[in-house]
């Protein structure tokens, strides 16, 4: 999958390309992550990419022209890589909140061009003409779009085929089917007086699967009850709940 990131701080994305699951995916050429600095497309000796906002007010606004040139360059690179469906995504607190369903849709794309804002944001005309989607990672403000962009890339990359060493691990993640994940345990059997649930050591896979589902359902009900209404349960899961509730 092709990713082009428009950012003033390309070095930050070594966190994606050099480490962990996403780093291994990059080394294996499952993903291509290219960072494009809009300063390279700015004019003048200082290569400015920001200016004071019209109408006054605090801070600076990123200028449309260097960003547009950077996006067009990214589109050329995507075309050279054989990618057809490559939307431009702007990471913004004003965008829709990212969730697992959106991530799964991104997985089906050929690639993404991700725009990282800075300062007070981006000239609205650039958004109107070049941005296809705006996404947020939550109702709070960060110093720039780089961290949200890394969240987006990591969440997509780990869902791509052949990226995870254990495909089942990704399938069982929180939110994949609308439920939170179940509690996880590893060695030792006892830690500070707390034991691993016996059922997890029983080797009875069907009972373990049932236990994990019931734990996930109960945890979601307690911590994120608004998610329960959106969950579609299988026939087996409904039976497990019915048995548990007597």
Swiss-Prot record:
It catalyses: guanosine(37) in tRNA + S-adenosyl-L-methionine = N(1)-methylguanosine(37) in tRNA + S-adenosyl-L-homocysteine + H(+). GO terms for biological process: tRNA N1-guanine methylation. Transmembrane segments: none annotated. Coiled coil: none annotated. Keywords: Cytoplasm, Methyltransferase, S-adenosyl-L-methionine, Transferase, tRNA processing. S-adenosyl-L-methionine binds at residues 117, 137-142. Its main location: cytoplasm. GO terms for molecular function: tRNA (guanine(37)-N1)-methyltransferase activity. One of its GO terms (cellular component) is cytosol. It is an enzyme of class 2 (transferase). It is found in: Cytoplasm. Its EC number is 2.1.1.228. It holds the Pfam family tRNA_m1G_MT. HAMAP family: TrmD (MF_00605). NCBIfam families: PRK00026.1, trmD. Homodimer. Specifically methylates guanosine-37 in various tRNAs. Belongs to the RNA methyltransferase TrmD family. This is tRNA (guanine-N(1)-)-methyltransferase. It comes from Acinetobacter baumannii (strain ACICU).
């Amino acid at each position: 999958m092709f990713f082009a990131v428009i950012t003033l701080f390309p070095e930050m994305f070594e966190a994606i390309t050099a480490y962990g699951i996403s780093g291994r995916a990059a080394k294996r050429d499952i993903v291509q992550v290219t960072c494009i600095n809009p300063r390279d497309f700015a004019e003048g000796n200082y290569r400015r990419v920001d200016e004071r906002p019209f109408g006054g007010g605090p801070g600076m606004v990123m200028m449309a022209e260097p960003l547009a040139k950077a996006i067009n360059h990214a589109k050329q690179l995507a075309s050279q890589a054989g990618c057809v469906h490559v939307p431009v995504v702007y990471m913004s607190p004003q965008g829709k909140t990212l969730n697992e369903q959106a991530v799964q849709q991104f997985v089906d794309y050929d690639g993404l061009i991700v725009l990282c804002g800075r300062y007070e944001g981006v000239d609205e005309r650039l958004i109107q003409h070049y941005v296809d989607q705006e996404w947020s990672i939550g109702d709070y403000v960060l110093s720039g779009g780089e961290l949200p962009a890394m969240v987006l890339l990591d969440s997509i990359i780990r869902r791509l085929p052949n990226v995870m060493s254990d495909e089942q691990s990704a399938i069982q993640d929180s939110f994949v089917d609308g439920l939170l994940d179940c509690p996880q345990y590893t060695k030792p059997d006892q830690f500070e007086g707390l034991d691993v649930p016996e059922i997890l050591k029983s080797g009875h896979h069907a009972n373990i699967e049932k236990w994990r589902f019931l734990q996930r359902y109960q945890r979601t009900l307690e911590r994120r009850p608004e998610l329960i209404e959106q969950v579609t349960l299988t026939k087996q899961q409904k039976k497990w709940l019915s048995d548990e509730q007597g």
